[in-house]
Amino acid sequence: MKQIKVISIFGTRPEAIKMAPLVRRLNENKNVESKVCVTAQHRQMLDQVLNLFDINPDFDLNIMKTKQTLTGITARVLEGLDKIFADENPDIVLVHGDTTTTFAAALAAFYKKIAVGHVEAGLRTYNKYFPFPEEMNRKLTGAVADLHFAPTLGSKKNLLREAVNEKNIFITGNTVVDAMNHTVEKDYVFENDELNKLDYKNKKVIMVTAHRRENWGKGIENICTALRRIAEENEDVEIVYLVHLNPVVKDVVYNNLNGMKGVHLLPPLDTKETHNLMNKCFMVMTDSGGLQEEAPHLGKPVLVLRDVTERPEAVEAGTVKLVGTDIKKIVDEAYKIMKDEEEYEKMSKAINPYGDGKASDRIVDAILYHFGVLKDRPDEFSPKK
């Protein structure tokens, strides 16, 4: 039987982290001819992940430019993929999540009448500008996708409400849990020596990331003010803020927090360093989507610095709390976790609703099932009670 030709396409670090374990599984399957195309929407951060998981792309569009616009990214991805799809004629294209690469790649495949598989399908806030542009990227990708790999039952329900055919939806769990089984080590020694010097046993190390567009300006200012207050009022706290390289974020953070006692401003870490810092820290504050899924796997409470989330499962499970960017709310909720052992225990022991480390296997099986290689529909992910 002819192999199924699959091209996996991604362009940013979060996409690469979540697609890497799937690419490995595709490469191992004798029924699949697996190829990888990167757009390099975020060049440096993407390359770190490719090296970590030993992935050598077959195609590299290398579209990144300084001060790139969403329109520019979309146009360059569409143009670059047009020729690749014409030459390769894959059976299916796999895209991930909600980046501009995701939407543009799905659209390019649709124009060539190539099937689209959407990994991490069905996440919704139902507000097209929060997060921007991710909410519309994933909705539009869902509109052209043929196979929808929903990480949770909630994601599947969102797709059903949008009239997606149930037979094309597969609940797989999230591939990020698969990735973390590869990256987290018990006695990890950091490459960044500043992280090795932190006292994780006797200090409350708070890991922070905040960079989303909807938080630019006033949102980041408020987050910094809250962090300053927490650092000033608590000698047993060390804040590690992984500061995004974008000057819109970086300049505000450094103006507010640089040189403060108990605050460590570091550039974004590679995936392995990030996952192991998360594993050692006390709690996480973030506006990142990925960290909302990763931290529960490691039993870390998360304060989400956003007003809405497309990942309500962790909120329902009790491991994540939405606090937005209100200064008082951030400080109050942080203190609740820091000073109330029962609250900390409740959040850290919550069931992880996002995966069991087998999402990539389920996605490969779903593809084989769709193309008639497997007769039986694969089993779906369900969180352990």
Curated annotation (Swiss-Prot):
Q: Reaction catalysed by this chain? A: UDP-N-acetyl-alpha-D-glucosamine = UDP-N-acetyl-alpha-D-mannosamine
List the keywords (alphabetical): Cytoplasm, Isomerase, Lipopolysaccharide biosynthesis
- Entry's Gene Ontology molecular function annotations: UDP-N-acetylglucosamine 2-epimerase activity
What is its subcellular localisation?
A: Cytoplasm
Name one cellular component (GO) term. cytoplasm
CDD domains reported in the protein's UniProt record: GTB_UDP-GlcNAc_2-Epimerase
* GO annotation, biological process: lipopolysaccharide biosynthetic process
- Domain of life of the native organism: Bacteria
Q: Identify the EC number(s).
A: 5.1.3.14
Name where it mostly resides. cytoplasm
Pfam families the record matches:
Epimerase_2 (PF02350)
Q: Which SUPFAM superfamilies match?
A: UDP-Glycosyltransferase/glycogen phosphorylase
Give the family, as the similarity comment puts it.
Answer: Belongs to the UDP-N-acetylglucosamine 2-epimerase family.
The protein depicted here goes by the name Putative UDP-N-acetylglucosamine 2-epimerase
